[in-house]
């Protein structure tokens, strides 16, 4: 069985976020910026032109990335309209138009010259969101500073009105003199933001080579400790105690960390309170963490963020620094880091499950109180089997085979259940039907997937049945069993066994695929690959690839989709082969 994961966000989550609007008539670039920014702590929308942007703009938009050179309604027009409407949003001009002194009086907040990089776009958006909370005079200073920086890239003699740059600098000095203290404080705040962003990028790069959970945790501590005083990773044991599994900074030894102090950051459910800051930690704990260097610092603070993936709590990261080392922005970014680490741990476990020569198989008995599928089986007095499940942020999409009841009856019964948001008949046969339903009331399956397990089988008859999970051999099986059996009533583990996988070589996979592909399909696949058609953004359009092959775009798509289907079928046919019998 295939277990999928989706990173889709619920409407409620997106509504609570800050909104970034990308405006560009180059749809590929606009989509690329959205792709870069997706998954950050804000919602991203696109407008493919000035008119579309004016229709979308309202007081819910926080940051606008705005192209200047667009047909009909230019970026300059959009910027003017934003200010005339009195919309309180930050605007970054993002354009290939080389800056000149005409920009001095334009009321933007930042100016980016294309081509732009992913890090440049992300950092600009993050900074502008922070600047939104600045006093108006301080915001004006940073906007003027951005204008000066854009013009500094030009030779003064080439500027249309060189004296305008001199006037700008005089104005910049005057604004700074008026708000000197506030500007210094905000500069320090932005500096911390930039250092934390750089730290996150360092962690992302370092995690690429980490292959186990232990490696991930130690790598994170090493990178974080390079930028701060020290860092430790904590895990909550089955007995409810805290255990330090990785540490770095000042020669810190995980075994020597007294964890009673940090325990305050954990709730009764064992989850860390995200962004919990200890303003000044006790002397004994300082000495344990910082050793002989403890006396060199006037005071030390600690930031505790959870390491989690969806609903799965892996532990916590504790970062130590000087007392003023953390603010709301850096705490929020460290929370993102905790989520990144949790995602990395989950992905590592999933890879080891996928690539391991052996896996651990866990079998559970489930009763009618285990979830909506068990209750549906009982209500219809029928047999259900789970064919596939996709993890969504707001629940699961389940594909089930129904025997002993029609697909229409199953859909009707599912719709009557308050825990099912959507149901449809996929295929209705005489003896068996296939139904898709979406629900947030399958906590057992959601918990298993979030812990990195693969749902192999779920069979139910008249309300009860068995659930079979596969999990990596080196995963924390005890934690998984505890999480699954406590996710819902009527669930108990009945068997645990190690299963050897059948091994097929890469050559056998290629032979299986070659036997299915026609010469034309193989050529279309290879040409699309080497031409960059599968890259983001695309290196070649479908029209360009089709032209190189001497075929029409519709014919290209027909061959390409057929070849992709055969490739995917071959992959999953091998992936889902039953374990070899010994």
Curated annotation (Swiss-Prot):
Domain Response regulatory: 19-129
Coiled-coil region: 165-203
Residue ranges occupied by any HTH bat-type domain in the UniProt entry: 517-569
Keywords, alphabetical: Coiled coil, DNA-binding, Phosphoprotein, Transcription, Transcription regulation, Two-component regulatory system
Biological processes annotated in GO: phosphorelay signal transduction system; regulation of cell motility; regulation of DNA-templated transcription
Keyword hit for Ubl conjugation: no
SMART domains tied to this protein: REC
InterPro entries in alphabetical order: BAT_GAF/HTH-assoc (IPR031803), CheY-like_superfamily (IPR011006), GAF-like_dom_sf (IPR029016), HalX_domain (IPR013971), HTH_bacterioopsin (IPR007050), RNA_pol_sigma_r3/r4-like (IPR013324), Sig_transdc_resp-reg_receiver (IPR001789), WH-like_DNA-bd_sf (IPR036388)
GO molecular function annotations of the record: DNA binding
Modified residues (4-aspartylphosphate): 67
Annotated knockout phenotype: Cells having transposon insertions in this gene are hypermotile.
Purpose: May be part of a signal-dependent gene regulation cascade that is relevant to swimming motility. May be involved in the transcription regulation of target genes.
Name the UniProt record assigns to this protein: Putative transcriptional regulator HVO_1357
Species for this entry: Haloferax volcanii (strain ATCC 29605 / DSM 3757 / JCM 8879 / NBRC 14742 / NCIMB 2012 / VKM B-1768 / DS2) (Halobacterium volcanii)
């Amino acid at each position: 069985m295939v277990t999928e994961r989706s990173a889709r966000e619920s409407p409620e989550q997106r509504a609570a976020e800050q909104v970034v609007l990308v405006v560009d008539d180059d749809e590929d670039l606009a989509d690329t910026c959205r792709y870069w920014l997706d998954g950050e702590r804000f919602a991203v929308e696109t407008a493919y032109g000035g008119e579309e942007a004016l229709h979308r703009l309202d007081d819910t938009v926080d940051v606008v990335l705005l192209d200047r050179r667009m047909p009909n309604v230019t970026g300059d027009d959009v910027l003017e309209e934003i200010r005339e409407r009195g919309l309180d949003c930050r605007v970054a001009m993002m354009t290939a138009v080389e800056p000149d002194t005409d920009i001095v009086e334009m009321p933007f907040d930042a100016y980016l010259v294309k081509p732009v990089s992913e890090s440049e776009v992300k950092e600009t958006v993050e900074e502008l969101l922070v600047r939104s909370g600045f006093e108006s005079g301080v915001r004006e200073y940073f906007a003027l500073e951005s204008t000066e920086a854009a013009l500094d890239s030009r030779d003064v003699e080439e500027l249309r009105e060189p004296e305008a740059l001199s006037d700008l600098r005089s104005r910049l000095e005057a604004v700074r003199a008026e708000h000197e203290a506030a500007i210094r404080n905000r500069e320090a705040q932005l500096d911390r933001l930039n250092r934390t962003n750089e730290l996150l990028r360092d962690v992302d790069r370092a995690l690429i080579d980490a292959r186990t959970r232990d490696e991930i945790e130690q790598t994170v501590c090493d990178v974080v400790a390079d930028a701060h005083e020290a860092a430790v990773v904590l895990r909550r044991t089955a007995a409810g105690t805290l255990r330090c599994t990785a540490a770095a900074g000042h020669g810190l030894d995980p075994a020597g960390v007294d964890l009673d102090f940090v325990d305050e950051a954990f709730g009764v459910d064992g989850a860390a309170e995200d962004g919990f800051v200890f303003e000044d930690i006790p002397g004994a704990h300082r000495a344990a963490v910082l050793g002989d260097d403890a006396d060199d610092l006037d005071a030390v603070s600690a930031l505790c963020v959870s390491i989690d993936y969806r609903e799965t709590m892996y532990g916590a990261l504790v970062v130590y620094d000087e007392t003023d080392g953390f603010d709301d922005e850096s705490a929020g970014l460290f929370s993102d880091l905790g989520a990144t680490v949790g995602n990395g741990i989950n992905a590592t476990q999933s890879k080891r499950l996928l690539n391991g020569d052996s896996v651990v198989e866990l079998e559970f008995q489930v009763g009618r109180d285990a979830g909506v599928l068990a209750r549906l089986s009982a209500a219809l007095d029928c047999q259900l089997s789970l064919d596939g499940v996709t993890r969504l942020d707001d629940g699961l999409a389940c594909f089930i085979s129904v025997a002993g009841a029609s697909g229409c009856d199953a859909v009707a019964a599912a719709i009557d259940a308050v825990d099912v948001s959507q149901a449809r008949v996929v295929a209705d046969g005489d003896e068996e039907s296939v139904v898709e339903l979406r629900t947030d009331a399958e906590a057992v399956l959601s918990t298993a997937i979030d812990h990195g397990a693969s749902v192999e089988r779920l069979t139910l008859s008249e309300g009860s049945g068995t659930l079979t999970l596969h999990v990596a051999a080196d995963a924390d099986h005890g934690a998984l069993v505890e999480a699954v059996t406590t996710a819902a009533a009527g669930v108990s583990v009945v068997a645990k066994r190690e299963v050897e996988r059948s091994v097929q070589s890469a050559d056998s996979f290629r032979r299986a695929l070659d036997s299915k592909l026609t010469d034309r399909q193989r050529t279309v696949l290879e040409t699309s690959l080497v031409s960059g058609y599968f890259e983001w953004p695309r290196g070649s359009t479908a029209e360009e690839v089709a032209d190189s092959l001497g075929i029409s775009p519709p014919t290209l798509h027909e061959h390409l989709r057929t070849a992709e289907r055969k490739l995917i079928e071959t992959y999953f046919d091998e992936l889902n082969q039953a374990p070899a019998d010994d």
